[in-house]
Structure formats: structure tokens, C-alpha cells
Amino acid sequence: MAQAHLAGSKKNARREGRLIVFVDESGLSERPTRVRTWAVKGETPVVQFHFNWHQLSLIAGMHFNGVCFRLHDGTIAKEQVVAFLKALLAHWRRPLLILWDNLQAHRSRMVRDYVASTGGRIKLHFLPGYAPDLNPVEFLWAWLKRHALANYCPDTFAELRHSARGKLKSAQRRSIIIASCWQQAELF
């Protein structure tokens, strides 16, 4: 059902020469994503970390053969969403069909006004509720947290920011990661 919901948007995007870009947000903190690991027999692995509520927010847009991302301290609000849409237009230099969830910032007046000011260069489509598996960017976040930064314990927030940026830049260069995100979403 949800895939049929997106089929019309996909056909129209191709007819209009638009890039289909999925957008999503996520967050990281100095508290690690703990995953199963190996250790010497008889020695329990210990993950020591700083308990801190400071959050690094991530926003990414993914096209079939590329990803564009930004990092922000704190939460992502409508201002950051508009700035990111501007960055996407500058990055891909083509009309865009943005597919994203129903986050309040995505539906804000500021975002709607900006999209209207682009002269049709951006069209928005909202994904069905409770369907994160339709967004390939969700699988990028899973890779980042469960593989690239799994059990990672930064000493400072700046170190977390540096590592997250480095791992996301690595994902940009590795087409196999982007392809696997699309494959897991089972959309195209």
C-alpha cells in the first residue's frame, strides 16, 4: 500500500525531471550506542562514557547515488530545515521532490513559505505515518549508529562531531553503503 502511495510521485518526478530525495533527521550524544562485541574469554567488556545530555542533530538527504548531510548542535527546527533545503538545491542543482516524514518542522509555515518562494524547484511529499522503513535515510542512521560509531565513547562533544562528520563523509564516498540503504528500503 505505502509503495503504491509513492508510485505516483515517482512517475511525476521523472516526467518533470526532478531528483527524488528522501530526507530525515537523527541525533547523537556522547552516550554510545552499545552493541554486542568480542572480548577475551572471562573478561567482560566495559564501555566507559560521559553521561551528557548535549545532543548533536543530523539531517540528511539521499538520492539514488548520493547523500548530502548537515550537523547541528541541539535539535533541528524549522530554520535548520529551510537552510538544509537551500543546501540541497545548491548541491544537486536540479528540481527536487522531497519525501520526508510528518515532523512538525517539515509542516511549518516557514518551510512552506520557502518552498513556495523556489518557484516550483522543490515539491514536498509526506510519507505515511509510522513508516520509517520506507525512508532509506533511516538505514543510513542505523549504519552510522550500529556499525560506524558502535560502542564509540568520545571524550568531548567536539570529538563526537568530528567522528560523525568523518563517518558520514565516508558513507558519501562508498556507493555500496548508499546502495544498501536503498535495497533495505525496498522502494525501487
Language model regions located:
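Short functional hotspots at interaction and active-site rims
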Residues: M1-F188
